[in-house]
Structures are given as structure tokens and as C-alpha cells.
Amino acid sequence: MKKIMFLGGAAHQVPALQYAKSQGYYTILCDYLEDNMGKFFADKFYCVSTRDREAILTIAEQVCIDGIIAYASDSALETAAYVSEKMSLSSYTPEVVSILSNKNLFREFLKNNGFNYPKSKSFTSVRDAVRGLSGFKFPLIVKPADSAGSRGIASIDHISELGPVFEKALSESAKKIVIVEEFIETTTDFMVGGDIIIINGKIEYFGMLNGHRDVKKNRCIPVGNSYPTFLDDEKSRQVQLEIQKVIDILSIRNGAMNIDVIFGKNDQPYIIEINARNGANMVSMLLKKATNVDLVGLSVEMALNNAPNAINQTVSDTCYATYYLRSYEKGVLERINFNSRITENIINMQMYKSSGDEIEPFDGLDKIIGILLFKFENQEELKYKMAHMNHYIQVQLVGQLQTRDGESSLCPLQVM
């Protein structure tokens, strides 16, 4: 029986554990939280930080694992790469993970290899940043060099706004490095995102998605994804060529990746991020519905050095989307009101909060209340409803006044 170690047992990581169990693999889970959901699906659980690579290596060697995976987790990627290298397992190299996981190193990589990139600079103190940003054009994006889930990311329009934004970003960085870069004005309505699968050094699967943003509240943080891509064929081809170029330079053979790309005013693609793991927040579920490819299963199999020779995918005429339930105010969740014109589109739902739970203002993906998976008849319906979701869904906190009539209970959710 093959043994596979999972780094992280959060709710969004459970599907990978479930897949491994369904295939008869022995599953070992490591997580620093004792009350994680994943331990109920694992054969063996160790309460240990996934950032403690020596402790993880010791356990991995004792158990004699055949593979290790940090499914949809940035924080444990470097540990997985370290253990894999020490035990000659199938994974990305530590060098590749370091470049892709640290935004300052990735910007240098892009610059040194002829890619498009925004003007940027890294700092360890706000004092140095104020001095070092002369010549930069506003607006600027300020973000931790090594955080995940869009934590600590914000835009500023004037240097006077830098102080608190910089300190917030610094607090979210494990390495205490903040990167500041010029905002890329885009020619498209959406970012380009999605997951890819690499086999024998080539992209064999490209699940390209539209990345939705709430530009009125925080243009830096995603609020959902949709399929199919709104890009034309030429722009889609450009994105794939740019990502393949990164794969070639880094000599990547096999693996799953999550990407973010923007087209600038010059109509050229700018790679914002490439993450050396699957996308979180129901990306794999969305793409499985849309393309009939099990990205979760593929990632587990590749961690065990069982990469397939080819991937068979279908092209769906149906439109799918995810949407992140959130509140921009702090409070206690009372209920969520849904208009009947949107409930007809919901095909799956993952809730992370319940009525009575404390809710923090949405400033990163760790503050998501829940995620909805939608099915739409066509792109027109998808675009309209995703752009006007506040007309269909309302997160109501205790003490807030209702603004819609005609509700019927779905407790703790409620239909308008």
C-alpha cells in the first residue's frame, strides 16, 4: 500500500484526502491545528506545524512515505519540496518553489528572463519604502512578498496612505518583506486565472478562468471565478505561451499550478503569480464540472509519481462560476438572504460560518463566509448576475436593517 503525506487538513484540502482514501492509499496528515477537519479522513494524524520542515521530514522518514503534497496550500509548499528532495520523491524542487512562492524573487525572475513585469521594489521597513518609491507612478499595489490568500494586499493612490497599508502587509509576511509595484491598467474586464497540469515538461491541461474582482471595494482581492474564458483565441494562446516559457526555463517536469495573468494597455500579458499548487476555493470543483477533469485526483497521483501520459478533457457549453460570500463590516452573522432568481443557479455550496459566528471585514480570502458554485445557461446571464450579485445575495449581520421583502426561511440561509 502506497503512503502519502498531506500537509494541511483545512476544509478545502479534504477532497484530496478523500480521493487518496478512495484509491486505497495510506494517508498521513500533518497540521498544527488539533481541530482540523482533515484528521477525520486520515489514517494517521500528527499535530505539527507544516512549516517545521525538519519535524515533517522526521515523520516522513519514520513512516516511509511514497509521496507528499501541500494541496492548495502556499504555506507548506517549501516544506513539501524540501522533504521530496531529501527523500527523492516526486515534487517541485526547492528552488522552483522559492522563486514562485516569493513575489520579490518571482519579479526578479520575470525581469531577468524577458517577461513583461510591473515596476516594483521590495522593502523591509516603511521608512525605506518612502525613500525608495520616488519615480513610481500611482496607484501602487502593496503586498507581502510571501503571503497567501490575498492577505495584506491593498492599493494606494498617494504616498501619504503608505504607512498603515505597509505595516499590514508586513504583518502578513513570514519573511518580513513587502513588495510595492505599479498598478497595471488592464484592457480586459477580468483577470485571467485557472489551473494547469504539466506532464513531461508540457502543459497538457489548461483550465483557464475569468478572475472576478470587486473593483468598488478592493480591486486587489478576488471574489470568484467563472468559465469559459472571455478571452479571444489569440490572447488565450499568448497566456499559454508565456506560462510554458516559465515552465521551460525552470525545467519543470510534472505538477499542478495555479496562475494569475493580466493584459496591460499594451495588449501584452503580465504574469502576476504562478503558484506551485492547485487553486483553492472550489477552483478544482468548478473545472471538473466544466471540463470533466479531476484535478484533485491528478495532483495526488502526480505526488505519488503516477503522472498520466495524457489528459482527456471535454469542452462544455455550460457556464459555471464561483462566488465568495463576504461582509465588509465586522459583526455577528444573522443570516444570508438569497433572491429566488439566484437560487436556481446554485449547484453547490460550502459554508465556513454559521448564524451567530463572528464575522471579520473581508480583506483577504481567509475572511470568506462561504463559497457558492453556480451554473448559468449562457455568458450573458453569467456576466450580468456576477456583476450584480449584491442584488441577489445579502449577508445580514445582527442589528442590520433588511432591505428586501418577501422572504421565506432556509435557515440559517434565507431566500428573498
What is each stretch, according to the model?
Residues K3-M5, L140, I203:
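Conserved hydrophobic helix-helix packing surfaces used for dimerization/oligomerization
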Residues N116-K119, P139-V142, S155-M191, R219-N225, ...:
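Conserved ATP-binding module of the ATP-grasp superfamily
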Residues A154, P164-K168, E181, F190-H212, ...:
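Beta-strand scaffold of nucleotide-dependent catalytic cores
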Residues R237-I259, K265, N275-G331:
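Active-site "cap" helix and flanking loop/linker of ATP-utilizing ligase/carboxylase catalytic domains
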Residues L325-S355:
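Glycine-rich active-site loop/lid that clamps phosphate-bearing ligands
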